[in-house]
């Protein structure tokens, strides 16, 4: 009989003020590195990598991800900064540096107040009230994106003031539409170029991260790939062995889009992929019910495949018999954890046109708003094409840095189209801070809640302050001058060192980026403030391993035992 013994490593625990101060140290050090990138005059950060040349970036989330401290409590603080940056990046695609600056300010002021006797729970209630007021004010300041010029302005700001990149992104969005797919690839020249290719997107990513081919970008990329489309779950490896054998013999990759892939089939595919015997990725079919069946048919027509297991189709996977004609093909498939982009499908052009016309007809006849919206999404994916930005540069370092900025700019642009724009460079939060003056006078607030409101009021003024400081000017003076101006659109242009109407000057931010940066920062900082203990692993002693046991009489050694 075997017995399993699990031993946990020794822990170090700190409580109260000591725990919070230790984490604060890590937060402040991490945020100082991230904050140097804020604004048009922000500086680059050079990051050592485990392989290749150092990475040069002005992207806040990239800097945050690279930071790790030797002290485990400081590292805990840095990890929380990384968490808020990642969350903001996932939800808004930009604003990570702003959220880092906010979280450091809220956490720092919060623990100072707690040390003087402020009730942390009441203080958090005050902070929550203040955040609500500011979000309403941000919403009232926002304007709808009405033209390509606004798109170019947002993209230019997020691309660190690069007008050419801003124009390129504006052109890409104009060609494929606001719901269209825009991707980046390494170019083969010194210039960055735009190309619109025939393609479609699928709102599902890889089933398992083991299918990733690029650990750095966490993407699976398959060139000149076969496509297998299945309306049924694939769980028996024997039924798809003929497909896998055909793919291995051809030397080409395989993309499987199926209702699901599980158990034995998934395990076998992952094992062979990791062994280098098979280039493969599996994606779960998008949509639900009838919509799922229709989208699988869209993918099949685009790629030239047959839908396996579709009711009435007569096409099934058979362990004894396999026809290569059931497989489709794409020139390239790029799969992330959230979505899949297919380029240059092998389907018949005439059938694709018929399919697009069919979906257009369904949209005209559809009476349900929900169903019409889903049909419009399908039409955009079928007919919109894919804009590919081929990023050029003199070196790999330059190309990667430019790709980071383009990714930020694309996310910001989509956010702006969806939720509108506000004055950029910090004045939106600055103006919103004045809306808290009325809340501070609210007699229903306790003294501790009022402290929470004041903490948020001070914090939301800091991003503008830091942008000005990075430009070499006195932050407090500029911030005060902006607040004195009665025109809500007026702010400070750090690039040209002057006060301008931010909308007219094209210095704008997506309202969603500002909203998400504040809510994420306030959420994480308030959780850190109310923590009363911090637990970390103690470093393990590097004691030498004990020598192996000699064999007993009549027995060999124990080297073969595992």
UniProtKB/Swiss-Prot annotation:
Main subcellular localisation: mitochondrion
Name of the protein described by the UniProt record = Chaperonin HSP60, mitochondrial
Pfam families xref list: Cpn60_TCP1 (PF00118)
Summary of the function given for this chain in its UniProt record: Implicated in mitochondrial protein import and macromolecular assembly. May facilitate the correct folding of imported proteins. May also prevent misfolding and promote the refolding and proper assembly of unfolded polypeptides generated under stress conditions in the mitochondrial matrix.
Q: What induces it?
A: By heat shock.
> Known NCBIfam families for this protein?
GroEL (TIGR02348), PRK00013.1 (NF000592), PRK12849.1 (NF009487), PRK12850.1 (NF009488), PRK12851.1 (NF009489)
Per the entry, what span does the transit peptide take up? 1-8
Disulfide pairs?
Answer: none
Question: What are the protein's GO molecular function terms?
Answer: ATP binding; ATP-dependent protein folding chaperone; unfolded protein binding
**Keyword presence, Transit peptide:** yes
The record, for SUPFAM superfamilies, names: GroEL apical domain-like, GroEL equatorial domain-like, GroEL-intermediate domain like
Compartment annotation:
Mitochondrion matrix
Species this chain originates from: Trypanosoma brucei brucei
